[in-house]
Each structure stands twice: as C-alpha cells, then as structure tokens.
Amino acid sequence: MTTVNAPEFVRHPKLIAWVEEIANLTKPAKIEWCDGSEEEYQRLIDLMIANGTMQKLNQEKHPGSYLANSDPSDVARVEDRTYICSQNKEDAGATNNWEDPAVMREKLNGLFEGSMKGRTMYVVPFSMGPLGSHIAHIGIELTDSPYVAVSMRKMARMGKAVYDVLGTDGEFVPCVHTVGAPLAEGQKDVAWPCNPEKYIVHYPETREIWSFGSGYGGNALLGKKCLALRIASVMGREQGWLAEHMLILGVTNPQGEKHYIAAAFPSACGKTNFAMLIPPAGYEGWKIETVGDDIAWIKPGEDGRLYAINPEAGFFGVAPGTNTKTNPNCMATLHKDVIYTNVAVTDDGQVWWEGLSKEVPANLTNWKGQPHVNGEKAAHPNARFTVAAGQCPSIDADWENPAGVPISAFIFGGRRADTVPLVSEAFDWVDGVYKAATMGSETTAAAVGQQGIVRRDPFAMLPFAGYNMADYFDHWLNLGAKVSEKAEASGNKLPKIFNVNWFRRDAEGNFVWPGFGQNMRVLEWIIDRCEGRANAVETPIGFVPTYEDLNWEGTEFTKEQFDLITNQDRDQWVTEIESHTELFNKLGERLPKALKERQAALLEAVKTGF
C-alpha cells in the first residue's frame, strides 16, 4: 500500500482520505504533494529532460524554456472520448456523449486499477481564479504526469497557498488523471507515455473529473476545459452565473473611457490574437489590455452589471500562425519561461512553427523528432505554448481583481467564408442569445476530425457545455431577464450582443478583411454603439454599420472591399436560418420556445426584408 504522508500544510481530512483512496486504486510507487515552488518546478523539468520527455532549448534565445514532443496519437482534445455522465441522460443532452454513471464508474475502476504502477502520483492543488475570490473555485488534480504538474503551475494558481484557502473543510473539485501506462519493475519508460484507449469523464452531480490515457493539454490539464467550462457551467447554472469559452479584453479610448468586452470564438479562430490586439495606425491614444484569452467566469453584481474573471493564470495558445506581425504581444509574452509542445526545433535549439517566418530554417527537426521534409508540417497544426499570463505586456492591471471586471458587450464569431457579415448588433438580449445559439464555424485542427466543414457551435461551447445545450440556452435567457431588472433599478443596462466574422472570402477564395490589429476598427464601432454614439443601419439580421460608420484613418481599405464582407444575400440567409432547424430538432422538447419564435420571425424578416 502506498504511504500518503500528507505534509503539515495539508489540514483537510476529507482530501487526505480521498488521496489515499485513489492511491489504493491506482497503486503509484510514491506520492508527491506539490507545493508550487520554483525548486519543485525545476526538479520536475530536470526529471523530464532525463526521461527524454522534454528538451532544453537555447537558453540565450529562450531562457527558462523547454520543448515536449507528444506521441503522434496524442495531439488534440478527443471530443468523441469525452463524456458527461449525469444521472439522467436528458441532463447531458444530445450534443454531449453520455454513459450511465454506474456503468462508467465500473469501466473506469477497471482502467484505473494499478494504472500508476511504477510512477509517481503528484497531488496538484490549484485555484481557478484569484486565490480567495468569491468567483474562484479550487480543484485538486491527482496525476502521474510530471508534464501536467509543471504545466498546471503556469495555467492555474498552483501551490501551497491553495491549502490555506481550503483550510480543513473547504470545497474542492476532485480531478483524477493517469496516462494509463503502468510500468512493471525494471521496465523502461517511453518519452511520452499514453494509452490508445482514452476517456475524459465528468460527473456533474458529484463535481468529479476522471481522465484516462492522454497526456495532452485539454485532456490532462483538468483545470482548463474540464473544470473551468464543463463542471463550472453546471455550477453556474445552479448558482446563477456563467462559465464561458470567452476572451476578456479592456479597451481604453483617448478620452480615458474604459470598457471590458467578452468574446466567444471557437478554438483556432483568433481568440488569443484578439485578446492581445495592438491598435493599428490611426489609433494613437487607444489602448487594448488583456484579462484572459480563453475562459471567462461571469457573475451578476449587486448593481445589475455582469462581472468577469479569467479563471486561468496562463495561456495555452496555438503556436502555428503566431508571429510578430499577427500577435506581437503574444511573441513578447514568449520571451522566457515557456513550455512548448509539438513545435519544431532548429539545430541550435530555437523553436519554429509554420507562420513564424517565411523562410523555413535549414536543419530543422520536426515535431515527431525527425529531420524536417519540405512540403510536410514541421510543427503540428495544434502545437502549443504554455506560459504565465503575467508575462504578457498587454496584461490588464485588473486581470487578477477578485471582484472581476464589468462587461459592456459580448461578441460572438466563427469562421465563415460567406453569409455572415463583418459585424452586426443584435436587436435585444433574446435576439443575441439566438445568434450565439446558432453560430456556425468551419472546423479546425484544435479538435480531432475533418477540417473545413461548417458545424453549429453554440456560444463556441459545443465541446464544453457540461449539461443539456437547450437548458444552457434557457439559462442565458433567464439570467438576462433577471439581471435586466436589477440593472434598470441601478441605472445600468445589460451588455449588448454583437456577431463578427473576420473570415469572409472573395470569389478567388482569399480573405478580404485584413484582421489582426485592424479588428480595432470594428471594436471602436462596438464601443460607440454601447455608448449610443455610433450610427447603424437596421437590417433583417441586426444593426450593421455602413462604410462611413467605421474609422478608416491609417488604412486604404476600400468601400468595395467593405461591401464584399458586409453584403447580405437573401437566399444565403434563408438557407442559413432554415439550417438552424437541424440543431433545434436535435435539442428537442427542452429548447426554449423563445428561440423557436425568434427563428420564425427572423426567417419571415429575411424573406421579406432583403
């Protein structure tokens, strides 16, 4: 039997008993209680270098930075192996995979039995959100992966201080993770242990997360998507708040007015770039600051405003396509202390990925550890960097404010080659919820499967909602109604809701909108709409700006180009709105009536209004 030996700073009997229970099941060779110290971090890094899991990069060019290359079978989230095991199948809904919790527990008990043999179990305490914030929640992850332990130190508030907040009886979300590769005595380990069989399982009622077989970020860093979205969305519904797949940014104009915006885009649609946007020429005196690039927890305040925190402490960003032109702030964030995964490396120990430079360096080693062959990808399309958010030059002064920051507007956007205009404002909260509920995006490399097909991704939460999607829509509608009453009483108003699409293409298939820093022009219009300053034209699908309503100083983007990405085609929109029925039918009886009514009204407006 493995000895638990909890250190003095752990004073929580229930937690200690749980660690003992999991140790008896998984049978690790030893248990290590992580304290989050620099010494511990370096020791685990050195251990992984010795094991071949990580390599030290050129310390002049990449001080404190390391590279891990995963097994080629373990490179992305595995949505088809991700389960919501609610007691009642209906509570998981048609967009989630469900298994009876009793059946799943039996299955997982079999898989986890002895799964950590020959390995160390790391007890990783973490807070999602600033320590002690009323919006924050604590998790404890038990993992046999040192890669997870060091990554969690960057991605969450990880360490001894968590136990001070937890005390002797504080609540925590129990997270169990194994790579599913036990070692027999004397057996040599591989560089990236994993198992062909993978399960990422959530039990919403008991707030448990169990992950088997994968060492990759989203499947193994259980504070991220598993706790911060799937479990937290269930908690939010019960407690009256939102857990969302959203970036949060602050915008300050030259007059010193500041607004915070939360924006939801599916994975690999530019959340990190937008969160770290640098205003273009013509926007001197404007400032964009970053609160978060991926997840927002949003709670109603007493004044009827919605306040958001970034529950994470780091960025787990997609490397390919990131460079000093597309995201200078991100590149500056990567100046030191980064864990890279599945990027390529030069012969002098510098990282490289597609899009970092036009020229492909000579003598490159690809993400599989082999010499790079021209015409093949040197870095995996879903290669990642893990870095502390505090290193970002555009980080907002209030990014760790335990009270959160007040949200003025929500933006929703997907990757669409046609139909959806550059920007539109919803008529009201219900209309905005409808647009977010039916947003579509072309699939990307962040999830396993086919690329380039339009799929409905409601609120960019399709892979992340921890309960029935129809109930999730209902929660948004109800929250809006409740907060609206409170806001009016305090002289405030609900955030406005906008849709954007940076990805319209011309007849030749090229992107028309330059994107990146130029998205500031759309952002300025959005803020001015929140302030009641900007003009717009009412169309059947919302309020849209004319060419003259946007600020074009410092650019030569023409009216003809603008018309290409804002024109609305009646037939395309009829097809679009009719195609929403497929999602609505899938969601069945629980779909809020207000959304069916909105669809009918929108279809009528589009048929007669264009």
UniProtKB/Swiss-Prot annotation:
Keyword Chloroplast recorded: no
SUPFAM superfamilies found in the cross-reference section: PEP carboxykinase N-terminal domain, PEP carboxykinase-like
Binding, Mn(2+): 225, 245, 294
Active site: 269
Role according to the record: Catalyzes the conversion of oxaloacetate (OAA) to phosphoenolpyruvate (PEP), the rate-limiting step in the metabolic pathway that produces glucose from lactate and other precursors derived from the citric acid cycle.
Cofactor needs: Mn(2+)
Record-level GO cellular component terms: cytosol
Positions of substrate binding: 77, 216-218, 267, 382-384
Top EC class, one word: lyase
Cofactor: record remark: Binds 1 Mn(2+) ion per subunit.
Main location: cytoplasm
Organism: Acinetobacter baumannii (strain AYE)
Entry's localization field: Cytoplasm
Reactions performed catalytically: oxaloacetate + GTP = phosphoenolpyruvate + GDP + CO2
Signal peptide per UniProt: none
EC number(s) stated in the UniProt entry for this protein: 4.1.1.32
Keyword Cell wall biogenesis/degradation recorded: no
Name used for this protein in its record: Phosphoenolpyruvate carboxykinase [GTP]
Lineage, highest ranks first: Bacteria, Pseudomonadati, Pseudomonadota, Gammaproteobacteria, Moraxellales
One Pfam family it belongs to: PEPCK_GTP
Gene Ontology terms: biological process: cellular response to glucose stimulus; gluconeogenesis; glycerol biosynthetic process from pyruvate; oxaloacetate metabolic process; propionate catabolic process; response to lipid; response to starvation
Summary of subunit composition and partner proteins: Monomer.
